[in-house]
């Protein structure tokens, strides 16, 4: 829409190295003259975070220019932001006069019949905030695209997307940043890698976690000396829990047939049936649901690993 209606030059870069649901970082440049920059953006005017779990895992605002705009898709009310945002993010927002907006695109998507598909809603919020195009004009272009793309899927799909576009424009919230955020204090992080293998602890702490947080380019060559021959400790996938799901399914023991088919078809081994003896059941984490196994004397539980 920007390129077509304003005769602007556009350059974009999208990259996702993981499987379905992995993080995708999109870099978009546009302007009235040809764009010759071949590098990723590190001084942005606008940054949007589409998944609230990313705020505690990645540096979401550090590439924003002072006075830039940050849009966060989250389920938190303005009053709940202080308790849920990391101190480093709050400091940067306050100290650099960042224009901070939130929108509950997750709730909107569910209510308009597009669960898990908030991208159109957030795009509408982007045009509303940025002022790149007049809001009514931008929304009109978006709806034209929706009709052209989804008309074959029926009127209901078209209406759901159009309703999402309207609500994305109307329900974005401007946050008044508290002055206290400028002095937000970091909490102590005493995370201990849960393994008794010294080489794995070192690998996870020095390489795996920094790479997972997109800080791999900051690692010195010395960090890889123990793996100079290209050999890495096996079993490291257990420490790559991304924790990015907004919603996690809950097992209902009253409706479970203990067939374990759900575990068999789960592609990521997230659903895990477990049988426990009395001692193991007593030592299970607080709140663990369990029932008597139909086939043994053990206690049966279906655990969701996230």
Residue ranges and their predicted role:
Residues 17-22, 38-42, 62-64, 91-95, ...:
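Solvent-exposed alpha-helices and their adjacent loops that cap or buttress functional pockets
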């Amino acid at each position: 829409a920007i390129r077509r209606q304003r005769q602007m030059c556009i350059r974009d870069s999208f990259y996702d190295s993981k499987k379905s649901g992995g993080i995708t970082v999109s870099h978009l440049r546009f302007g009235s003259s040809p764009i010759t920059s071949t590098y990723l953006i590190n001084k942005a005017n606008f940054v949007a975070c589409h998944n609230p779990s990313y705020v505690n895992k990645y540096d979401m605002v550090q590439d924003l220019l002072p006075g830039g705009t940050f849009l966060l898709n989250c389920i938190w009310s303005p009053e709940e932001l202080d308790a849920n945002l990391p101190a480093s993010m709050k400091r940067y927002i306050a100290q650099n006069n960042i224009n901070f907006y939130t929108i509950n695109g997750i709730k909107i998507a569910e209510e308009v019949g597009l669960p898990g598909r908030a991208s159109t809603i957030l795009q509408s919020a982007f045009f509303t905030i940025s002022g790149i195009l007049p809001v009514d004009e931008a929304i009109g272009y978006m709806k034209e695209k929706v009709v052209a793309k989804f008309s074959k899927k029926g009127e209901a799909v078209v209406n759901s997307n159009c309703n999402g576009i309207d609500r994305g424009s109307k329900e974005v919230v401007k946050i008044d940043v508290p002055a206290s955020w400028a002095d937000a204090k970091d909490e102590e992080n005493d995370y201990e890698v849960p393994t008794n293998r010294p080489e794995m602890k070192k690998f996870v702490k020095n390489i795996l976690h920094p790479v997972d947080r997109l800080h791999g380019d900051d690692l010195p060559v010395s960090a890889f000396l123990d793996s100079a021959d290209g050999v890495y400790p096996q079993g490291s996938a257990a420490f790559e829990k991304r924790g990015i799901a907004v919603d996690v399914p809950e097992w209902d023991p009253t409706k479970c047939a203990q067939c374990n088919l759900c575990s068999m078809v789960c592609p990521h081994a997230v659903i895990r049936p477990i049988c426990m003896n009395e001692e193991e059941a007593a030592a299970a984490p607080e709140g663990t649901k369990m029932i008597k196994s139909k086939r043994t004397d053990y206690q049966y539980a279906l655990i969701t690993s996230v």
